[in-house]
Amino acid sequence: TFTWAHRISNRAVDFLQQPARAEEPFLMVVSYDEPHHPFTCPVEYLEKYADFYYELGEKAQDDLANKPEHHRLWAQAMPSPVGDDGLYHHPLYFACNDFVDDQIGRVINALTPEQRENTWVIYTSDHGEMMGAHKLISKGAAMYDDITRIPLIIRSPQGERRQVDTPVSHIDLLPTM
């Protein structure tokens, strides 16, 4: 199956293999459309998650009674697939995330040893996903951790490893580098 992620990764790998990349500094932003509609990924990834359910715990029981009205309207407009068991089943979403993870690996593995020595690799996202928490799906005008707590993984050329637990913003990236 050929997807947008394949194309983006192929172009990124081709870019890294150009002779100029060995001699000149560069910035490369690799941005994938998955896991958004139409949730296109190879069938083997979909099969892997066909029976996968994400347990929401207490977040599945929120009736939104004490929440702003727009949350209730959002829940009505986009009904959550989460049942009384509190399990979220969306194999396409999880399959696309796994597929994109493999595509990111392809791009990182295409870096030459010399490029790895002086390249920052930053992995992040623009938003999270409600996945049925609080009876909501997708993203929207809410400040739940499900939407705002997104990954930010930075590998600096120096390879310094540490974890930062304080809130940060994308605006902090450039000063960090």
Predicted regions span which residues?
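Catalytic core of tubulin tyrosine ligase-like
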Residues: L173
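Active-site-proximal cap/lid insertion segments
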Residues: T1-I8, F15-H170
